[in-house]
Protein backbone atom coordinates (compact mmCIF):
# COMPACT_ATOMS: atom_id res chain seq x y z
CA UNK A 1 0.00 0.00 0.00
CA UNK A 2 1.10 3.55 -0.74
CA UNK A 3 0.11 6.14 1.87
CA UNK A 4 1.20 9.76 2.02
CA UNK A 5 0.10 12.40 4.51
CA UNK A 6 0.67 15.90 3.14
CA UNK A 7 0.30 19.14 5.07
CA UNK A 8 -0.58 22.64 3.88
CA UNK A 9 0.97 25.22 6.23
CA UNK A 10 -1.24 28.08 5.14
CA UNK A 11 -4.59 26.43 5.87
CA UNK A 12 -3.29 23.78 8.32
CA UNK A 13 -5.00 21.15 6.17
CA UNK A 14 -3.96 17.51 6.01
CA UNK A 15 -4.32 15.81 2.64
CA UNK A 16 -3.95 12.08 2.06
CA UNK A 17 -2.87 10.12 -1.00
CA UNK A 18 -3.80 6.43 -0.89
CA UNK A 19 -3.16 3.58 -3.32
CA UNK A 20 -3.00 -0.18 -3.01
CA UNK A 21 0.01 -0.03 -5.32
CA UNK A 22 -1.33 -3.02 -7.24
CA UNK A 23 -3.49 -1.45 -9.93
CA UNK A 24 -1.64 1.90 -9.83
CA UNK A 25 -4.93 3.70 -9.08
CA UNK A 26 -5.00 6.33 -6.34
CA UNK A 27 -7.34 8.56 -4.43
CA UNK A 28 -6.75 11.83 -2.62
CA UNK A 29 -8.66 13.06 0.44
CA UNK A 30 -9.10 16.81 1.15
CA UNK A 31 -6.85 18.40 -1.50
CA UNK A 32 -5.96 22.11 -1.27
CA UNK A 33 -6.08 24.04 -4.54
CA UNK A 34 -2.67 25.70 -4.06
CA UNK A 35 -1.04 22.25 -3.89
CA UNK A 36 -2.63 20.62 -6.94
CA UNK A 37 0.60 20.73 -8.96
CA UNK A 38 2.44 19.14 -6.03
CA UNK A 39 -0.13 16.31 -5.95
CA UNK A 40 0.08 15.79 -9.72
CA UNK A 41 3.89 15.62 -9.55
CA UNK A 42 3.73 13.13 -6.67
CA UNK A 43 1.30 10.96 -8.63
CA UNK A 44 3.71 10.99 -11.60
CA UNK A 45 6.68 10.23 -9.35
CA UNK A 46 4.85 7.23 -7.87
CA UNK A 47 3.49 6.16 -11.29
CA UNK A 48 -0.11 6.42 -10.07
CA UNK A 49 -3.34 7.40 -11.80
CA UNK A 50 -5.74 9.51 -9.73
CA UNK A 51 -9.22 8.04 -10.12
CA UNK A 52 -11.05 9.48 -7.09
CA UNK A 53 -10.85 12.62 -5.00
CA UNK A 54 -12.79 12.98 -1.76
CA UNK A 55 -13.71 16.08 0.20
CA UNK A 56 -14.75 15.31 3.77
CA UNK A 57 -16.89 18.47 3.85
CA UNK A 58 -17.22 21.92 2.32
CA UNK A 59 -14.21 23.82 3.60
CA UNK A 60 -14.58 27.39 4.87
CA UNK A 61 -10.86 27.91 5.46
CA UNK A 62 -9.50 26.97 2.05
CA UNK A 63 -10.55 26.24 -1.51
CA UNK A 64 -10.64 22.57 -2.37
CA UNK A 65 -8.43 21.32 -5.15
CA UNK A 66 -10.93 18.61 -6.15
CA UNK A 67 -12.34 20.37 -9.23
CA UNK A 68 -8.89 21.30 -10.52
CA UNK A 69 -7.68 17.72 -9.99
CA UNK A 70 -10.75 16.48 -11.87
CA UNK A 71 -9.96 18.85 -14.77
CA UNK A 72 -6.36 17.60 -14.94
CA UNK A 73 -6.82 13.87 -14.25
CA UNK A 74 -10.48 13.17 -15.13
CA UNK A 75 -10.94 11.61 -11.66
CA UNK A 76 -14.36 11.35 -9.99
CA UNK A 77 -15.18 13.82 -7.23
CA UNK A 78 -16.79 12.26 -4.13
CA UNK A 79 -18.56 13.77 -1.14
CA UNK A 80 -21.12 12.65 1.40
CA UNK A 81 -24.76 12.88 0.40
CA UNK A 82 -25.40 15.67 2.92
CA UNK A 83 -23.30 18.13 0.92
CA UNK A 84 -24.98 21.05 -0.82
CA UNK A 85 -22.12 21.11 -3.38
CA UNK A 86 -23.32 20.70 -6.95
CA UNK A 87 -19.98 19.71 -8.52
CA UNK A 88 -19.87 16.16 -7.16
CA UNK A 89 -20.15 13.09 -9.40
CA UNK A 90 -20.51 10.53 -6.60
CA UNK A 91 -22.41 11.09 -3.35
CA UNK A 92 -21.90 8.44 -0.70
CA UNK A 93 -24.28 7.62 2.11
CA UNK A 94 -23.43 6.76 5.69
CA UNK A 95 -22.01 3.21 5.87
CA UNK A 96 -21.49 3.01 2.09
CA UNK A 97 -18.11 1.85 0.74
CA UNK A 98 -15.71 3.46 -1.71
CA UNK A 99 -13.55 0.85 -3.45
CA UNK A 100 -10.07 1.30 -4.85
CA UNK A 101 -8.46 -1.95 -5.99
CA UNK A 102 -8.46 -4.05 -2.79
CA UNK A 103 -8.90 -1.02 -0.51
CA UNK A 104 -12.28 -0.20 1.00
CA UNK A 105 -13.14 3.07 2.70
CA UNK A 106 -16.35 3.15 4.70
CA UNK A 107 -18.15 6.49 4.59
CA UNK A 108 -19.31 7.63 8.01
CA UNK A 109 -21.59 10.64 8.46
CA UNK A 110 -19.91 12.62 11.24
CA UNK A 111 -21.69 15.96 11.56
CA UNK A 112 -20.46 18.48 14.04
CA UNK A 113 -17.59 20.41 12.47
CA UNK A 114 -20.06 21.14 9.67
CA UNK A 115 -23.47 19.68 8.89
CA UNK A 116 -22.05 17.87 5.84
CA UNK A 117 -18.92 16.38 7.49
CA UNK A 118 -18.03 12.79 6.66
CA UNK A 119 -15.16 10.66 7.92
CA UNK A 120 -13.75 7.67 6.05
CA UNK A 121 -12.61 4.46 7.72
CA UNK A 122 -9.97 2.31 5.98
CA UNK A 123 -9.10 -0.78 7.98
CA UNK A 124 -8.15 0.85 11.29
CA UNK A 125 -7.41 4.34 9.89
CA UNK A 126 -10.09 7.02 10.35
CA UNK A 127 -9.74 10.06 8.09
CA UNK A 128 -11.81 12.58 10.02
CA UNK A 129 -11.29 15.70 7.93
CA UNK A 130 -11.50 18.61 10.34
CA UNK A 131 -13.74 16.84 12.86
CA UNK A 132 -10.68 15.86 14.89
CA UNK A 133 -7.38 17.69 14.87
CA UNK A 134 -4.05 17.13 16.56
CA UNK A 135 -4.59 18.24 20.17
CA UNK A 136 -8.17 19.32 19.55
CA UNK A 137 -11.30 19.27 17.49
CA UNK A 138 -12.48 21.25 14.50
CA UNK A 139 -14.40 24.45 14.97
CA UNK A 140 -18.16 24.06 15.26
CA UNK A 141 -19.17 27.72 15.09
CA UNK A 142 -19.91 27.93 11.37
CA UNK A 143 -21.65 26.02 8.54
CA UNK A 144 -24.27 24.58 10.90
CA UNK A 145 -21.60 23.08 13.14
CA UNK A 146 -22.53 21.63 16.52
CA UNK A 147 -20.10 20.48 19.24
CA UNK A 148 -22.52 17.89 20.66
CA UNK A 149 -23.10 16.40 17.20
CA UNK A 150 -19.34 16.25 16.68
CA UNK A 151 -18.82 14.28 19.88
CA UNK A 152 -21.75 11.94 19.29
CA UNK A 153 -20.79 11.23 15.67
CA UNK A 154 -17.46 9.66 16.66
CA UNK A 155 -18.03 8.23 20.15
CA UNK A 156 -19.68 5.07 18.76
CA UNK A 157 -16.53 3.87 16.93
CA UNK A 158 -15.71 0.70 18.82
CA UNK A 159 -12.84 -0.94 16.94
CA UNK A 160 -9.25 0.15 17.66
CA UNK A 161 -8.69 3.03 15.29
CA UNK A 162 -5.78 5.26 14.31
CA UNK A 163 -7.15 8.75 13.88
CA UNK A 164 -5.84 10.93 11.07
CA UNK A 165 -4.40 13.48 11.33
CA UNK A 166 -1.70 12.14 13.60
Descriptions of predicted regions:
Residues 1-49, 119-129, 135:
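Conserved beta-strand hairpin/beta-sheet module of binuclear metal-dependent hydrolase folds
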Residues 12, 23-24, 33-109:
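Active-site HxH/HxHxD metal-binding segment of metal-dependent hydrolases
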Residues 17, 97-125:
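Core dinuclear metal-dependent hydrolase active-site scaffold
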Residues 25, 86-88, 135-143:
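A short acidic, helix-capping loop that chelates divalent metal ions and anchors anionic groups
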Residues 31, 58, 82-83, 113-114, ...:
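Active-site metal-binding loops of divalent metal-dependent hydrolases
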Residues 64, 144-145:
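Residue-level signal for the nucleotide or nucleotide-sugar donor/cofactor binding architecture
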Residues 146-153:
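Active-site glycine-rich loop that binds ribose-phosphate moieties when present
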Residues 155-166:
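Single conserved hydrophobic/aromatic residue that forms the stacking wall/gate
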Amino acid sequence: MIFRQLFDNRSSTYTYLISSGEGREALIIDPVIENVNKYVNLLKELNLKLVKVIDTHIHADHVTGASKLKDITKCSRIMGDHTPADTVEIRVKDDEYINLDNIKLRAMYTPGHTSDSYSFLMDNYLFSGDTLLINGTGRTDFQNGNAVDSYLSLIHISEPTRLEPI
